[in-house]
Amino acid sequence: MLALKISVYSVVFFFIGIFVFGFLASDPSRTPSRKDLED
């Protein structure tokens, strides 16, 4: 049961990480660091 719980949490955090990374990468206009890079 412990191995099943660990595997489920691993998959959940993996998809959450992909979602957050994709959201930040697809919407760079809202991040202030984009303007710093353009300067």
Curated annotation (Swiss-Prot):
Biological process annotations from GO: photosynthesis
InterPro entries: PSII_PsbI (IPR003686), PSII_PsbI_sf (IPR037271)
Principal location: plastid
Keyword Thylakoid among UniProt keywords: yes
Pfam families documented for this protein: PsbI
Transmembrane feature ranges: 6-26
GO cellular component, as recorded: organellar chromatophore thylakoid membrane; photosystem II reaction center; plastid
Keywords, sorted A to Z: Membrane, Organellar chromatophore, Photosynthesis, Photosystem II, Plastid, Reaction center, Thylakoid, Transmembrane, Transmembrane helix
Localisation per UniProt entry: Plastid, Organellar chromatophore thylakoid membrane
Top-level taxon of origin: Eukaryota
Membrane topology classification: Single-pass membrane protein
Family of this protein: Belongs to the PsbI family.
NCBIfam families per UniProt: PRK02655.1 (NF002735)
Job of this protein: One of the components of the core complex of photosystem II (PSII), required for its stability and/or assembly. PSII is a light-driven water:plastoquinone oxidoreductase that uses light energy to abstract electrons from H(2)O, generating O(2) and a proton gradient subsequently used for ATP formation. It consists of a core antenna complex that captures photons, and an electron transfer chain that converts photonic excitation into a charge separation.
Complex formation: PSII is composed of 1 copy each of membrane proteins PsbA, PsbB, PsbC, PsbD, PsbE, PsbF, PsbH, PsbI, PsbJ, PsbK, PsbL, PsbM, PsbT, PsbX, PsbY, PsbZ, Psb30/Ycf12, at least 3 peripheral proteins of the oxygen-evolving complex and a large number of cofactors. It forms dimeric complexes.
Protein name, entry field: Photosystem II reaction center protein I
Gene name as annotated: psbI
